[in-house]
Amino acid sequence: AIGSKALTVWLSDGSNFPGQQNFTRAFERYLHSMGEIYKTLPDDWRLFSEHKMYEPAFYSTVVQDWGTNYLIASTLGPKAQCLVDLGHHAPNTNIEMIVARLIQFGKLGGFHFNDSKYGDDDLDAGSIDPYRLFLVFNELVDADYRGVKDFHPEHMIDQSHNVTDPIESLISSANEIRRAYAQALLVDREALETYQQENDALMASDTLKRAYRTDVEPILAEARRRTGGAIEPIAAYRASGYREKVAKERPESKSDGGAFN
């Protein structure tokens, strides 16, 4: 119904104590199960495996990092690729380099966009580290610029909206994702490559920051207008009264919010 031709699998398999799980056998079971799914996948579909460092298990996770994820995708076959959730990494992980590696070897399937401070926080995209989001898109735009073959990563949002209107957060996140993309398009690729070849670290970094500091909001607003959208989408959403309307139509919850009812 929605035209999807990709299946993402994230499993919480892992352990909380040393010795609780045999690492090798656990991974063998994972590969076997994914292999069964892969065999039934239509020829024009892709299978994405997703890594996550920890949680709900805190000692080990079967698919804990991009290296294991790459092994999975390589073992299963050409229809298998890696999905990168920005929040599924340790703080300060160089996610943009992971993206570059997966692009280089044809195994970047797509993204779950969000943001984080400590771990898998599932905060709104661009709310904590918008520069990192820009650097990720810099790698995507660079791949397009270099003409990487069969490069069609999927873009998804995976967030948890606990203190905001979920629709408003999704609108804001979509805007931040588009902003990072627009800024990445402004990078002077020829100049950047020259500085990289000359090992001019300062000017190479400045080339990226110059694009990042550019105010692209007027471009984004005009793009929304040309496609029939609102120039100020959150203001338009609030003025529509949609939230109040659906709140009246929503059935009353019979739960008191406790764990036991």
Where on the chain are the PLM-derived regions?
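Extended recognition/assembly regions associated with phosphoester-bond processing machinery
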Residues: 25-28, 32, 36-46, 60-61, ...
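Gly/Pro-rich active-site loop or hairpin
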Residues: 20-21, 59-67, 89-154, 158-175
